[in-house]
């Protein structure tokens, strides 16, 4: 499931560009969040309830460190997708980050092979 502050049409373009369009089952976008974006904790809780997610088996990827904090607090694994600029912004959120990558597609491929 893609959990995004963007709209579905934009996300589909990005996923297609990254050749990840067939990896995800659904998109939980800003409209489905009732325009209450991440990192609002209630939005994460609604996502978990909407899909009956087992947080112990769920992973949240995000390029914004602050969006990983509520996910970690709820028990999800977290992956920081970064570039050099974002590395400077981590400021203490690293305790809430389980993994880091600068290549989402590569990370997903490795994860899927090993799990």
Model-derived regions, located:
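Asp-based, Mg2+/Mn2+-dependent phosphohydrolase catalytic module
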Residues: 12-115
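Conserved phosphate-coupling serine/threonine residues in phosphotransfer and NTP-handling enzymes
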Residues: 4
């Amino acid at each position: 499931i893609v959990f995004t502050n963007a709209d579905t049409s934009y996300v589909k373009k990005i996923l297609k560009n990254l050749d990840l369009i067939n990896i995800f089952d659904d998109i939980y976008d800003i409209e489905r969040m009732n325009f209450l974006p991440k990192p609002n904790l209630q939005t994460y809780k609604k996502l978990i309830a909407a899909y009956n997610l087992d947080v112990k088996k769920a992973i949240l990827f995000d390029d914004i460190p602050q969006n990983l904090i509520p996910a970690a607090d709820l028990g999800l694994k977290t992956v920081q997708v970064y570039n050099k600029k974002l590395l400077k912004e981590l400021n203490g959120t690293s305790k809430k980050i389980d993994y880091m990558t600068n290549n989402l597609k590569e990370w997903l491929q490795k994860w899927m092979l090993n799990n």
